[in-house]
Amino acid sequence: KASVGFKAGVKEYKLTYYTPTYETKDTDILAAFRVTPQPGVPPEEAGAAVAAESSTGTWTTVWTDGLTSLDRYKGRCYHIEPVAGEENQFIAYVAYPLDLFEEGSVTNMFTSIVGNVFGFKALRALRLEDLRIPTAYVKTFQGPPHGIQVERDKLNKYGRPLLGCTIKPKLGLSAKNYGRAVYECLRGGLDFTKDDENVNSQPFMRWRDRFLFCAEAIFKSQSETGEIKGHYLNATAGTCEEMMKRAIFARELGVPIVMHDYLTGGFTANTSLAHYCRDNGLLLHIHRAMHAVIDRQKNHGIHFRVLAKALRMSGGDHIHAGTVVGKLEGERDITLGFVDLLRDDFIEKDRSRGLFFTQDWVSLPGVLPVASGGIHVWHMPALTEIFGDDSVLQFGGGTLGHPWGNAPGAVANRVALEACVQARNEGRDLASEGNEIIREASKWSPELAAACEVWKEIKFEFEAMDTL
């Protein structure tokens, strides 16, 4: 209200931005922040500061405030609760009016909500735990290029998880040797093989050579097995133009799927690639390289469930989501929380799984979670039980480390998977009978028996960092 007169000076954020009586709207974007204030800063002031600095506020009153309606545009901290078991930590809930965000831009959403506020001096640490994306905003995104059902129809594969394998050593192979490794894995029974996230176009293997040899491997293995095969050709590049050039070449080769590193490549590049993939019938596999830099600390950063939601909006058909049982981080309930966020249309709020809000995706296609990292045949029953049919299970070392080579390694994994799916369909309990199911299957498959022998004692047992 300009008529009241402009009063210069610094005033507390909580006078304007802490509104405990606010009723959230269906169109608001809601955020749950884990706030650790500096000593002496009350939680209401800290929560209000987060709301202010991530929306309309700045450190002092400015006369141009009178030229707009702050009540319409400001973020509001509407609820604060202490974190159980932690000293001086609070969950601050902030509501943002939808008008603050550009339609269809994950980039703009993150620039607003987490762009500036994390360096704020009044806070010791800050973590974005969850976002509620309103249906009105969801509808401005294309989302995944195809989604789970369309992918199954394209591949003609139903009723079981899909099997993949990352080609190792990740760096140093020539294109022809790389293509040979791909062929052996696909020929042995895998559905997919994968470029490692840091395989782009290096001196020892330029991207075009790799694409050609991998395409040859795909078509040769398809003709021999009668199954549709794919290799995640990594299109990630130094510029968006180069990335698109690689995706276009993949489409010209007639392969089914390409890949992108969405955090290092950036959301803008990722969304462009996702749009191209839908328009041209390519599936899009997403790797989350760099995620742990952002999500591993418990009290600072962004939780992966938020990055997973952002990916579903930006677009991708697969995304790596931890394993719960392998060598990489992932606590079971929390992991399953964001796995459901990726796959389901509607997910209820459930704090025991880290879900702070109910999320309605209104017909945005689902994303297949990918379990990858330090897993082998003995993990197959647990993975089948935990992730269910709509998932991709990726065994890199667990395929290529087989004593007889890549193709027998692929056979071992496929036999183990088929045995677990059959046992589950017959009503057996994979959690308690898993080892027995694998042992029974290995009697009929020398490849599986050899794999069981090699990896019988390997475990990666550490406490998960990410607890509720």
Curated annotation (Swiss-Prot):
Maturation and modification: The disulfide bond which can form in the large chain dimeric partners within the hexadecamer appears to be associated with oxidative stress and protein turnover.
SUPFAM superfamilies in the record: RuBisCo, C-terminal domain (SSF51649), RuBisCO, large subunit, small (N-terminal) domain (SSF54966)
GO cellular component, one term: chloroplast
GO biological process: photorespiration; reductive pentose-phosphate cycle
Annotated site (Transition state stabilizer): K327
Cofactor, free-text remark: Binds 1 Mg(2+) ion per subunit.
List of catalytic residues: K168, H287
Keyword terms: Calvin cycle, Carbon dioxide fixation, Chloroplast, Disulfide bond, Lyase, Magnesium, Metal-binding, Methylation, Monooxygenase, Oxidoreductase, Photorespiration, Photosynthesis, Plastid
Modified sites of kind N6-carboxylysine: K194
Cellular localization per UniProt: Plastid, Chloroplast
Residues annotated to bind Mg(2+): K194, D196, E197
NCBIfam families for this protein: PRK04208.1 (NF003252)
Subunit (UniProt): Heterohexadecamer of 8 large chains and 8 small chains; disulfide-linked. The disulfide link is formed within the large subunit homodimers.
Family, per entry: Belongs to the RuBisCO large chain family. Type I subfamily.
Protein function: RuBisCO catalyzes two reactions: the carboxylation of D-ribulose 1,5-bisphosphate, the primary event in carbon dioxide fixation, as well as the oxidative fragmentation of the pentose substrate in the photorespiration process. Both reactions occur simultaneously and in competition at the same active site.
Official protein name in the record: Ribulose bisphosphate carboxylase large chain
Species of origin: Cornus alternifolia (Pagoda dogwood)
Gene label: rbcL
